[in-house]
Curated annotation (Swiss-Prot):
Natural source organism: Brucella anthropi (strain ATCC 49188 / DSM 6882 / CCUG 24695 / JCM 21032 / LMG 3331 / NBRC 15819 / NCTC 12168 / Alc 37)
Lineage: Bacteria, Pseudomonadati, Pseudomonadota, Alphaproteobacteria, Hyphomicrobiales
CDD domains listed in its UniProt record: TtcA-like
Note: The thiolation reaction likely consists of two steps: a first activation step by ATP to form an adenylated intermediate of the target base of tRNA, and a second nucleophilic substitution step of the sulfur (S) atom supplied by the hydrosulfide attached to the Fe-S cluster.
GO cellular component: cytoplasm
Protein name: tRNA-cytidine(32) 2-sulfurtransferase
Length: 292
C-alpha cells in the first residue's frame, strides 16, 4: 500500500478527530459534506502526485472561507493518517486598513496549529504606485507571491498550498479564453521559475458552494476580503455570473467542464505546437483519429 492510498476507508481514524472538529455538530448532512470534500481533496492530491512523505507544506491562510477549509481538510487527512507531510499555516498580513490582527493567531493558538504570522506592509506600496481608482489585486498578488516564496524557503517548506477551488479554475479558464485568446487555467500543481518550490491546489475539484457550507458549519471566524476597498476586476465577476447561469440552466455543467480539462485532445484543436498536423499521412489502414 502506498503512503498515500485513495482506497483507504473514509472512516479511518473515526475513533477520534482533529480538535478543529470536536465542537462541530455531527449532523448527517454535515458528515456527508465533510466526506465529499475529503474525498475530492484526496482525489486531487493523488491525481496530481502531490505527496512525498516527510515533506513540509506551507498552507496559506488568508482568513477567507476557502483557506480555512483547505487547512481544516488537510489537518483532517493528516489526523487520519492519509497525509504523511508536515503542515505549517502561514498568514501574510499585508497592512490592509482595519485588518483584525487578533483573529488568526487566536484561532490557530486555540487549536494548537503550527503557524507563522508575517507582517509586510505591501498595501502602502500598492497604494503609492497605483491611482485610487485602480484595482489593486494584480500588483498586490505579485507582492504577496514574492513574500510567500521567501517565507516558504525560510521555513524549509517544499510546497506552497493554496485554497483555489473548482470555480476559481473555471473562471480563470474562461477569462483566458475570452480575453487572452488562449486555453489555460490554474494548474493544480506548478513548479516555480527557480525550480525549488511547488505550488499545490488540492481543492481543484471542490465546489465553492460546498466550501461555503463547510465554513458556516465549522463556524470559522471569516475575515472580509474587501478590507482594502478594492474589488477584483469586472472580468472575473462576469465569468462567475456566466458560470452560475449555466449551472442553473444545466445542472452539473461545472463538473463536466472540469472533467473536460482532464480529457484534452490536441489533434482536435488548432495548436500546431501541440500536434504535428504536417506529419499526418495517408496510410490506407483507416486507423486514424475520428472527429466527433
Amino acid at each position: 500500500m502506498n503512503a498515500f492510498d485513495p482506497d483507504i476507508a473514509e472512516d479511518a481514524g473515526s475513533d477520534g478527530c482533529h480538535p478543529l472538529f470536536r465542537d462541530v455538530p455531527t449532523t448527517v448532512e454535515f458528515n456527508k459534506l465533510r466526506k465529499r470534500l475529503l474525498r475530492l481533496t484526496r482525489q486531487a492530491i493523488e491525481d496530481f502526485s502531490m505527496v512525498k512523505p516527510g515533506e513540509r507544506w506551507m498552507v496559506c491562510l488568508s482568513g477567507g472561507k476557502d483557506s480555512y477549509g483547505l487547512l481544516a481538510l488537510l489537518l483532517d487527512l493528516k489526523w487520519r493518517g492519509l497525509l504523511p507531510v508536515e503542515l505549517l499555516a502561514v498568514n501574510l498580513d499585508q497592512g490592509q486598513p482595519n485588518f483584525p490582527k487578533h483573529i488568526l493567531p487566536d484561532f490557530l493558538n486555540r487549536y494548537e496549529i503550527e503557524h507563522r504570522i508575517e507582517y509586510q506592509d505591501t498595501y502602502s506600496i500598492v497604494t503609492d504606485k497605483l491611482p485610487e481608482t485602480s484595482t489593486y489585486c494584480s500588483l498586490c498578488s505579485r507582492l504577496r507571491r514574492g513574500n510567500l516564496y521567501r517565507i516558504a524557503r525560510e521555513e524549509g517548506c517544499s510546497a506552497i498550498v493554496l485554497g483555489h477551488h473548482r470555480e476559481d479554475i473555471l473562471e480563470t479558464f474562461f477569462m483566458n479564453l475570452f480575453h487572452g485568446g488562449r486555453l489555460a487555467a490554474m494548474p493544480p500543481k506548478l513548479l516555480n521559475d527557480e525550480g525549488d518550490l511547488m505550488v499545490f491546489r488540492p481543492l481543484a475539484y471542490a465546489a465553492e458552494d460546498d466550501l461555503e457550507k463547510f465554513a458556516t458549519a465549522m463556524q470559522f471566524p471569516i475575515i472580509p476580503c474587501d478590507l482594502c476597498g478594492s474589488q477584483e476586476g469586472l472580468q472575473r465577476n462576469a465569468m462567475k455570473a456566466m458560470l452560475t447561469d449555466i449551472e442553473k440552466r444545466m445542472p452539473g455543467r461545472k463538473d463536466t467542464m472540469i472533467r473536460a480539462m482532464t480529457n484534452v485532445r490536441p489533434s482536435h484543436l488548432l495548436d500546431r505546437k501541440l500536434f504535428d498536423f504536417a506529419g499526418l499521412m495517408l496510410n490506407g489502414e483507416g486507423e486514424g483519429d475520428h472527429a466527433v
